[in-house]
Amino acid sequence: DHLFVSYEAITSHLIDRITDAFIQAGEFRQIRIHGDCHPGNVLWTDNGPHFVDLDDCVTGPAVQDLWLFLSGDRESRSRQLQDLLEGYSQFYNFDYRELYLIEALRTLRMINYTAWIARRWIDPAFPRAFPWFSENKYWEEHILALKEQAAILEEPPLEIA
C-alpha cells in the first residue's frame, strides 16, 4: 500500500515537472522520428550504420532520437550532445529549445516502460519474462529513480559550448 501511495505521489509530481519542461521548450517542430533510437538499435555494417527496430516510429521532437545516445555525468552528456548536434546539424536544423525536453522525455520513458509491463501483466509470458516486476524491491528502486529524476528536472537543461 505504501508503495502505491509513493508511486502515485511521485508520478503526479513528475507530470507537473514534465509539463513545465514542455512549456519552457515552447512550440517545437514535429517530425518523423525513430522513437526508440539508441546504440542497440543501430546495426553497423561495412556500408555504415542502419537503424533497426522501427516499430516505435512516431511523430515528435528531434531530440527524442538523440537523448538516448547520451550517458555518463552531466559534463560527459554535454560533450556527447555537442558532438551529436554537430553531426545532426549537417543534415537538419536543430531547435535548441528542445534541450528542455531531454529529462522530461527520459522521465516519460521510465514511467511508460513500467506501464507497458503492467498493462501486459495478465499475459503469462510477462511474469516469466519480468519476475522482478511484482517484487517490492523493484518498486522501491523505481520510485527512488523517479525521485532522482525529479531532482534532475529541477536543473537547467544540458548546455553545449
Where are the model-predicted features located?
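Structural signal for well-ordered, non-membrane alpha-helices
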Residues: S12-T19, S89, A115, K147
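Hydrophobic core segments within long, regular secondary-structure runs in both alpha-
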Residues: S12-I15, Q82-L85, E140
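A structural signal for short hydrophobic/aromatic patches embedded in well-ordered alpha helices
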Residues: Y7, T11, L84, L101-I102
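Active-site acidic catalytic loop and adjacent metal/ATP-binding pocket
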Residues: T19-L66
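All-alpha amphipathic helical-bundle segments outside canonical DNA-binding/catalytic cores
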Residues: Y96-R106
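ATP/Mg2+ or Mg2+-diphosphate-binding catalytic cores
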Residues: H2, A115-A161
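Active-site activation/catalytic loop segments of kinase-like enzymes and analogous catalytic loops
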Residues: A62-F94, R109-A125
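An alpha-helical support segment within catalytic cores of ATP-dependent transferases
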Residues: D1-G35, I152-E159
